[in-house]
Structures are given as C-alpha cells and as structure tokens.
C-alpha cells in the first residue's frame, strides 16, 4: 500500500477492509519518514505493531 492511500484510509470516517498477513487490521498512524504504519488486529486491539506499508493490503 502506498503512503497516500494509507493516509486516506486513516483520515476516512468509513472503515476500510485492510489486511496484514491475511489478518483484518486497523491503521492507527502512518509514519511518512519511515514508510511504516502503526496497526492492530481488529479482534485484538491491544496487539499494536509497527509494520511496513508495503505489507498492507486493501481488500
């Protein structure tokens, strides 16, 4: 996923279907400098991770 699209998803009031390794996730924050995003699985909000944007897929 590119940085611009990830930022659009974060700012959107609508929930978008995004996955990381096949797991549905929520994007909390996009770091443009490092090309990463802070995410968590929808069913485990306490499990935050910092991942590369190119590993995220929009369904």
UniProtKB/Swiss-Prot annotation:
Induction: Expressed only in the forespore compartment of sporulating cells. Disappears after 45 minutes of spore germination. Expression is sigma G-dependent. The keyword Lyase does not apply. GO terms for cellular component: endospore-forming forespore. It is found in: Spore core. The keyword Transferase does not apply. GO terms for biological process: asexual sporulation; sporulation resulting in formation of a cellular spore. InterPro entries: SASP_SspH. Keywords: Sporulation. Pfam families: SspH (PF08141). NCBIfam families: PRK03174.1, SASP_H. Belongs to the SspH family. This is Small, acid-soluble spore protein H. The gene is sspH.
């Amino acid at each position: 996923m590119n940085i611009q699209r990830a930022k659009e998803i974060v700012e959107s009031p609508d929930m978008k279907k995004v996955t990381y390794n096949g797991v549905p996730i929520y994007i909390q924050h996009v770091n443009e400098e490092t090309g990463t995003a802070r995410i968590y699985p929808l069913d485990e909000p306490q499990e935050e991770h910092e991942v590369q944007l190119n590993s995220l897929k929009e369904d």
